[in-house]
Design a protein with these regions (language model features):
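Bacterial N-terminal signal peptides
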Residues: 1-9
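Flexible coil/turn and secondary-structure edge motifs
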Residues: 11-181
Length: 181
């Protein structure tokens, strides 16, 4: 019994996951990487309804005792053009269209509520779709940490394409008691 109780805190330390599509996975990886509470960010692909339909995404591994899914959503909403369902900035097509991939009813609730709140604030509904998490396929090694390994090329691409520089975006704290895993 004592052994089981001692193992409980270790189980809690596992990272939660969230999946975001917001155009180029290079840009999304740079947005979430190197932030407190985020363990790692993996660029990759999420399979769509058909075999030929997939989106560039990032899978964010985070510590839900230090950072909530709601806080990740707030960062995401700052970085994407929520009214452009045809892609993001200069990257066009379904592959680059914004979407949230939710894992369970709590993430679904937060995704829907935050999207609705954005719609109320802007006076029109965001074009960001919400799907259940599907099969994640990691991007090839050449795409991993592209923003770090090719920093000058990445900065030029991001700037020419029109993506905002996410380093200036902050994670505003949520209201006390509203933390959701």
């Amino acid at each position: 019994m004592l052994t089981a109780l001692l193992l409980l805190p270790a189980c809690r330390a596992q990272a939660a996951q969230a999946v975001f599509a917001g155009g180029s996975f290079w840009v999304m990886e740079a947005l979430f990487a190197d932030r407190p509470g985020i363990e790692r960010v993996e660029p990759g692909w999420m399979q769509g309804e058909s075999r030929l339909q997939r989106r560039q995404v990032v899978r964010v591994h985070y510590h839900d005792d230090r950072l909530s899914y709601g806080e990740l959503l707030r960062l995401y909403w700052q970085a994407v053009d929520v009214f452009d369902a045809g892609g993001q900035y200069c990257d066009r097509g379904t592959e680059f269209s914004p979407a949230l991939y939710v894992d369970g009813p709590l993430q679904l609730k937060w995704a829907r509520q935050s999207r609705s709140q954005l719609g109320l604030e802007w006076g029109r509904q965001p074009e960001v779709r919400i799907f259940a998490v599907g099969r994640f396929e990691p991007a090839a090694a050449r795409h991993q940490q592209y923003y770090q390994r090719h920093s000058l090329l990445y900065a030029a691409y991001r700037s020419v394409c029109g993506y905002p520089d996410g380093r200036g975006f902050s994670l505003p704290p949520l209201l006390a008691g509203s933390r959701v895993n």
